[in-house]
C-alpha cells in the first residue's frame, strides 16, 4: 500500500522516529511454544534464555532506545519460568511492560493464580493472540476469547486482541472492534496481514483492502502511519485512533490533527514518544464527548459522525478510546530487489547484541549462528543492519 491510496494522504501523520527515539521494543526470553501458528516467523523453537541473559538484553535495548514500552513475546512467554521476574525488572526501568500471549496457559488456569502473579509483578497490559490460525488448539475461537477476556475484565487488566489477517479473515476487523467494545478494559486490535518474504507465489492479503473495509464498515480513517525503509510513500503500519460507543458500535475517528497534538503533549510531558496510550477507561469515557465535540468544531464535516456516536450514549460517558494498528510484514521489493520493512522497526528486538527487526531476526541473525535449512541472507543482513544503525557501510 502507498500513501496515495488513502482518502486524504496529505493530512495523515507520518511516524518516523530515529533509531534512538523509538519508543517500543520487544524481548524474547524464550523461543519455545506450546502451539504452532500457521504464519509464525520463528524458525528456532528450542532456546530458553536465563534471567541474567534477558536482563542484559533489557539493559542493552534501553540504552539503544528511549523506550516507553517493552513487549515480551516469544515463542510463548508464559512458558518462561521467570516471567514474573522479567516483568518486574522491566518495570524497575520505569518502562511499561506488555505481554503477548496465545492465552493457553491462562485458559488452563481457571482460578487465575498465574495471571494474578503477573499482575503483581507489574504487567501493564496483555495482548491476546487467539485467532483462526490456532483453530487446531481452540475449537471455538470466540469462546476462548470470551473466556479469557472475562477473566481479564474481572481483574481490571487492560488487554488488546492480536490477530493475523488471512484470506479467510479479510474485512473482519470492524466486526471485532464492535463486538469487544463492551469490555471496559479492552482497548484495541493489533493486526498483521498474512505475508511472507520467502515464498514468491504465496497469496497475500493487501493492507489497502483492510483500509477500505474499515472505512466502509466502521466509518474511520487512519490518523497516522509508519513508512518503510525504502520510501515514505510506502505504508507499512496503518494506525487508527477513535472513540467507540459500546452500546451502538458507532465510532468517531480522531483526526490526524488531534492525534498529532496528543502525541506532542505526551512527548513534552514524559520526554518520550508515545507508542501506546495507556488505557484509562473511566477517564476516557468522561472526556470522550468533549474531545469528539472539539474535533468536530475544527472539522465541521464530522457532525454526522458525532451525532451517530452520541446516539444512545451520554455526554459524560459517550464512548471508549480504542486503536487499531495494522502491520505489513517485510517482503522483497521486486523492482528494487531489496527487502522492504518498517522504518526503524517499531518491534525491534535484541539479537546477538544487535537491534534487529523481530520478524526477520531468524533469517538474518539466528541465535545459534545458523538455521540449518535456511541460509542467512547476507544482502538482507547488510541492508537491515545499516538501516537500523548497527552497521556502517
Residue spans of the language-model regions?
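N-terminal capping/interface segment
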Residues: 5-9, 31, 40, 96-98, ...
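Canonical Radical SAM [4Fe-4S] cluster-binding loop centered on the CxxxCxxC motif
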Residues: 16-53, 64-65
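Radical SAM/AdoMet-radical enzyme domain recognition
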Residues: 55-72, 80-198
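Radical SAM enzyme [4Fe-4S]-AdoMet core and its adjacent flexible, acidic
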Residues: 136-320
Amino acid at each position: 500500500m502507498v500513501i496515495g491510496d488513502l482518502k486524504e494522504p496529505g493530512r495523515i501523520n507520518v511516524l518516523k522516529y530515529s533509531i534512538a527515539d523509538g519508543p517500543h521494543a520487544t524481548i524474547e526470553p524464550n523461543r519455545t511454544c506450546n502451539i504452532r501458528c500457521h504464519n509464525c516467523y520463528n524458525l528456532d523453537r528450542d532456546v530458553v534464555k536465563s534471567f541474567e541473559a534477558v536482563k542484559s538484553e533489557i539493559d542493552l535495548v534501553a540504552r539503544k532506545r528511549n523506550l516507553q514500552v517493552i513487549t515480551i513475546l516469544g515463542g510463548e512467554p508464559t512458558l518462561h519460568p521467570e516471567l514474573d521476574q522479567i516483568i518486574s525488572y522491566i518495570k524497575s526501568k520505569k518502562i511499561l511492560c506488555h505481554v503477548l500471549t496465545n492465552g493457553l496457559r491462562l485458559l488452563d488456569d481457571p482460578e487465575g493464580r498465574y495471571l494474578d502473579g503477573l499482575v503483581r509483578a507489574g504487567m501493564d497490559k496483555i495482548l491476546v493472540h487467539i485467532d483462526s490460525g490456532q483453530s487446531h488448539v481452540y475449537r471455538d475461537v470466540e469462546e476462548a476469547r470470551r473466556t479469557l477476556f472475562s477473566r481479564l475484565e474481572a481483574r481490571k487488566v487492560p488487554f488488546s486482541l492480536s490477530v493475523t489477517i488471512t484470506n479467510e479473515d479479510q474485512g473482519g476487523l470492524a466486526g471485532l472492534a464492535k463486538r469487544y467494545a463492551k469490555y471496559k478494559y479492552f482497548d484495541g486490535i493489533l493486526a498483521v496481514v498474512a505475508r511472507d518474504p520467502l515464498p514468491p507465489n504465496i497469496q497475500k492479503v493487501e493492507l489497502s483492502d483492510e483500509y477500505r473495509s474499515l472505512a466502509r464498515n466502521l466509518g474511520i480513517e487512519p490518523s497516522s502511519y509508519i513508512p518503510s525503509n525504502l520510501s515514505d510513500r510506502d505504508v507499512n503500519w496503518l494506525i487508527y485512533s477513535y472513540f467507540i460507543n459500546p452500546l451502538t458500535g458507532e465510532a468517531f475517528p480522531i483526526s490526524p490533527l488531534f492525534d498529532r497534538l496528543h502525541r506532542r503533549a505526551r512527548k513534552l510531558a514524559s520526554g518520550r514518544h508515545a507508542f501506546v496510550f495507556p488505557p484509562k477507561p473511566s477517564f476516557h469515557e468522561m472526556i470522550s464527548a468533549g474531545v469528539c465535540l472539539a474535533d468536530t468544531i475544527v472539522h465541521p464535516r464530522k457532525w454526522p459522525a458525532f451525532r451517530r456516536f452520541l446516539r444512545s450514549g451520554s455526554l459524560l460517558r459517550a464512548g471508549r478510546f480504542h486503536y487499531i494498528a495494522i502491520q505489513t510484514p517485510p517482503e522483497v521489493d521486486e523492482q528494487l530487489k531489496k527487502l522492504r520493512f518498517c522504518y526503524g522497526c517499531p518491534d525491534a528486538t535484541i539479537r546477538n547484541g544487535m537491534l534487529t527487526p523481530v520478524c526477520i531476526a531468524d533469517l538474518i541473525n539466528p541465535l545459534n549462528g545458523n538455521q540449518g535449512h535456511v541460509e542467512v541472507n547476507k544482502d538482507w543482513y547488510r541492508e537491515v543492519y545499516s538501516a537500523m544503525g548497527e552497521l556502517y557501510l
